[in-house]
Amino acid sequence: MNDTNDRRRLGLLVALLLAVTASSYLGAQANAPITIQKQGSFAVGGKILGDAEGKSLHCDHGYVDYQIPVKPRRVNLVMWHSAAATAWLNRWDGGEGYQSIFLRRGYPVYIWDGPHVGRANWGCTENTYKPGIGRDQGNFTAWRFGAQYPNWFEGVQFPTKNEEAWNQASRARYLEFDTVVNAQMQSDAAAKLMDKIGPSVALTNSAGGMRAILTALKTNNLAGIVMYENVGYVYPEGEGPGGTVGGFGPIEVPLEEFKKLTKLPMQMVWGDNIDKAGNYSNSYKLSQLFAEKVNKYGGNAEVLKLTDVGLKGNTHIPFADMNNVAVADQLSKFLAKHGLDKR
């Protein structure tokens, strides 16, 4: 009898030690230095304008910086925002963002600025910037921090007492050019990026998603798309939601062209409170329609509500939220499910 009890105690002790060891290992991994074997940056795509005198202007290109970790996985992650690439770099409070999280997980990470925005703003056409007083308050509701400034949603995944976090978030913007023409131009450059770097999964946010969908029609090197809170879609001719085409579509293409989207897995991810601020309820319904059309023709598209997997309070930019590691875990599951995590 005593021997049985001793064995039980020993078993419990071993289990406890293994749990502590695993926890310590994971903690050490999270805080360990990130080892990079290669990093750099380059412009890609674009045009060259010229005149009769031989003068020229390089313009309408995209710009990317990248880091490749030691012993990288085979598929790159291209992080594509529509408002500011900085959203991929940090959590709202300055903690680790998706760039660092996925470098630690072994993925080559590319931070992308499409033509005309951020570090690629040398355009071939004239643009005018007009300061918009009140944009900060507009961001508050558009990013679903709350239904009305300055009233935060209860449990929102933002450090609401951190004034510097709000200051940094308010400065994480640059001009957006939300037209179908611009979306096509950006996808032209992005397709050239994919062809240069090889098989990649595009991670997008907001208007970036429609641009990545268009990119998939122009390259065979887009291995998947994960769209965080996408607001624009592409449909087969005659099967879209109808209505006037605006900056976020809807765009319709011939069925045979649309079927290219059935060759890669796609996931549309949504945060919390989508029915309480902005026009996200409609965007959510459009994501369901898009998935329905892709799957109708043999594709693999899914819609994930983070609340359905127990994640509460996420904003329009969940990969920068305070629980972004848990959000990243959902992405890791998607990548593994589709064989996109191989080394």
Residue ranges and their predicted role:
Residues 317-343:
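Catalytic active-site module of serine/aspartate enzymes centered on a nucleophile-bearing elbow/loop
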Residues 99-121:
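Conserved alpha/beta-hydrolase
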Residues 203-212:
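Gly/Ala-rich beta-loop-alpha elbow adjacent to hydrolase catalytic centers
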Residues 231-298, 302-304:
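The feature captures the conserved acid-bearing segment of alpha/beta-hydrolase catalytic domains
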Residues 87-97, 114, 280:
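The serine-hydrolase catalytic nucleophile loop
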Residues 180-201:
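Conserved acidic catalytic loop of the alpha/beta-hydrolase fold
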Residues 29-72:
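N-terminal cap/lid segment of alpha/beta-hydrolase-fold proteins
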Residues 74-82:
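Short beta-strand element of the alpha/beta-hydrolase
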